[in-house]
Amino acid sequence: LTLLKEKGSYFFKPYGKGKGTGVVIMTYDYEKDTPCIDLKPITKEEFINYLKKHDDWFLSEAMKQHHFLDEIYDKTVNTIRFITLKDPKTHQFKVFFAVQRIGTKETIPVDNGSRGGLVANIDLETGVLSEARCLHNRNVYKVHPDSGAPIEGVQVPGWQKLKEDMLVLADKLPYMHFIAWDILITEEG
């Protein structure tokens, strides 16, 4: 509790789970002097009991995402899923596709499509987002269903450098032929 109060927020992640299963964000509400799980205030006793009840987990320090992501939906971490493939002839990596994953009120604190998050294609040349789709109901969203913020037409900042950086990273893993990356853009890049 002291660490949470000092840092302000942490992600609590269970080992061996995928697709955002069991992930919660722990924050501290300084005005109410109380911890929160997934943005809901709880008592200090409930917080301690929650930690005691879960013994196979780790904490990850929360990162502040780029403001363009907060403008779309600020209650979840919204990542880009990059797929890089190695060309079998040239042995050079290429960005095969990229999507912006966007959380919803159903997925707090994560953006996973398998939990009801949205997925918008990113134009590989321009870095501009398409409309978003929900894998659960196949609905199409030009604006975020919870925040009302535009999705379609939004420019991913620093797109060209981001693509270049992904290829540099992929080249550092020469034994890989297919890599799926989940990237969080921050103000620093």
List the model feature ranges, each with a label:
Residues 1-76, 80, 85, 89:
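Active-site nucleotide/adenylate-binding loops and adjacent lid/helix of ATP-dependent enzymes
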Residues 53-75, 84-90, 95-186:
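A long amphipathic alpha-helix within ATP-dependent nucleotide-binding catalytic cores
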Residues 1, 188-189:
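Short, intrinsically disordered, charge-balanced linker/junction segments flanking boundaries
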